[in-house]
Design a protein with these regions (language model features):
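N-terminal cap/lid segment of alpha/beta-hydrolase-fold proteins
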Residues: 6-44
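Short, surface-exposed "cap/lid" segments of acyl-processing enzymes
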Residues: 42-94
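Alpha/beta-hydrolase-fold enzymes
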Residues: 122-127, 131-132, 136-224
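Short beta-strand/loop motif that positions the catalytic acidic residue
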Residues: 236, 242-244
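Catalytic active-site module of serine/aspartate enzymes centered on a nucleophile-bearing elbow/loop
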Residues: 269-310
């Protein structure tokens, strides 16, 4: 494909991660931020011709979906015949942080990053995609669909893992705590997740402050213009698979179910990953995607659901 007509998409750089061939491109958003976009093509020509876009959560990056050793859900889906695309949201992984890193907001990623990713993937495949998001990656995806920043006709279906906004982080319900944390973040410029063992990436102060606004006492899940992301969930009509995990203390099942119930999809499924539903263990927030057990029972469950909707 001649990418010269798409000025916002670079030519690919070819990488090898543990024997897995990866194409790395840079794309440009409408507000002129540069994002890294990795692609793993279907293995051995076993192509289903359907793109799958994987959106990481907070404190995360490409390695959540494909490790440096070439292991991960992204590789598994490519082995199953899917055309896998792994973007890194601004300020994460190979997407540059830049001088204004501290000012990056959640809305920047919802309003600008996700549409740029959708445009790039569609430009290079001419095919609507499956979208999968973990944690805030899934929440951002739902928000973008809710207010129409993502084009619904280019989304085959969506899958979320541990994505919610209503529960967890109960300390933020105490106004003095929320105010103090916001003030500290403004001074620090970032949230040092790696030092706290929460993930490989620091998160911008702007993103953290915005999520505090959503979760604090009487907080509202809205855009900067006051548009409710909740209200538009009923407009999401494509098939949806919502995964929640029994031992997820970050984003518990009750919060995931609350969002799931608001979705307008007729074809929607809610699955709690735990022993009571026939799984080998009660999964937690990260282990529901990244663990040996997930590799054996969650990944095949997901792949089967996707294939049934081709």
């Amino acid at each position: 494909m001649d990418l010269q007509q798409y000025k916002s998409i670079s030519e690919p750089e070819h990488q090898l991660l543990g024997g897995v061939k990866v194409e790395l491109r840079n794309i440009c958003t409408a507000d002129n931020s540069r994002l890294a976009l990795s692609r793993i093509k279907p293995k051995n020509g076993k192509s289903l011709a359907i793109p799958v876009v994987l959106i990481h959560g907070s404190y995360s990056m490409r390695s959540f979906w494909v490790s440096d050793k070439g292991v991960g859900l992204g590789v598994y889906l490519a082995d199953q015949g899917f055309d896998v695309w792994i973007p890194e949201l601004r300020g994460h992984g190979l997407s540059p942080k830049g001088e204004s890193f501290s000012q990056i907001t959640a809305e920047d990623q919802i309003r600008y990053d996700l549409p740029a990713i959708q445009d790039a993937v569609f430009a290079m495949t001419q095919t609507p995609a499956f979208w999968i998001g973990h944690s805030f990656g899934g929440l951002f995806l739902l928000a973008a669909l809710s207010v129409g920043w993502l084009q619904h006709d280019q989304v085959v279906s969506i899958v979320t893992f541990g994505s919610q906004i209503s529960f967890g982080d109960t300390y933020l319900k105490f106004p003095p705590v929320a105010w103090a944390l916001s003030a500290i973040l403004k001074m620090a410029g970032n949230f040092p997740a790696p030092k706290l063992g929460l993930g490989p990436e620091v998160e911008s102060a702007g993103t953290m402050i915005e999520t505090i606004r959503w979760k604090q006492f009487r907080g509202k899940w809205t855009s900067s213009e006051g548009v409710s992301y909740w209200d538009g969930l009923a407009n999401i009509k494509m098939p949806v698979l919502t995964y929640a995990a029994v031992d997820d203390k970050n984003d518990p099942p009750a919060g995931c179910r609350k969002i799931h119930k608001r979705l307008g999809s007729i074809d929607k499924m809610f699955m709690v990953l735990g022993k009571d539903n026939g799984f080998s263990k009660d999964y937690d927030h990260v282990g529901m995607v990244v663990s040996k057990e997930a590799q054996e029972e969650v990944w095949p469950d997901l792949a089967g659901w996707l294939k049934d909707r081709i």
